[in-house]
Amino acid sequence: MPEMLQLGPVTVCAPDDGAVLRYSEQAVQDVLDFFSLLCFGSNEWAGEPFQLLDWELDAIRSFYGVQEQDEDGSWSRYRRFLYDELPKKNGKTEVAAGLGLYHLLWDGEKRPKVGIFSSDKDNAAQVYDAAKYMVEHTCLGQPEHDPIAWAVDSKREIHTKYGGVLKVYSADVANKHGYSFSAIIFDELHAQPNRKLWDVLTAGSDAARRQQAVIVLTTAGDD
């Protein structure tokens, strides 16, 4: 059995390379503070303040709270992948949209590039639509003459005044080589016909990013 470390409320396997880990309450609180600015972006709760469910809080603590010490003594996010399989109607689209906006606006990247992927472009567009609603119905889209972020429906993109972009991409593999995303939101991974798109998006794509995030929130499939 691998050695386990208890870091605050999170249990992790001890790193094989001897990396020094810690649990950062502040890193978790930064994510929670951002979500406190958001509203729900779809269904009958649209416009209501965003209330995180227990599973969402657990995922945030586990992914964002664990940090490793870098060679220069600074701390960065230890985990690159957040993966959760969920039953239907469990808030997956909403939290995916919220996390996409977090990585677009709040994660410390100077020019973030957030990609939203799914089994088809229309499915990924549900995440975009929720994120767009959140931007346009909260302080993120204010003031109207100089907003922090705004949507470009013709391209299914959300831009920021600081040069960041969140965008819906097709599931075509051939034109995805060479992308460097600061964050990847992958919806309904179980519905992919094979692992080609996954491999193209994740193999080496973090080389130019200090703490790339790959977030997979999927409905449990048959395979």
Model-derived features with residue positions:
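Phosphate/NTP-binding elements of NTP-utilizing enzymes
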Residues: 1-223
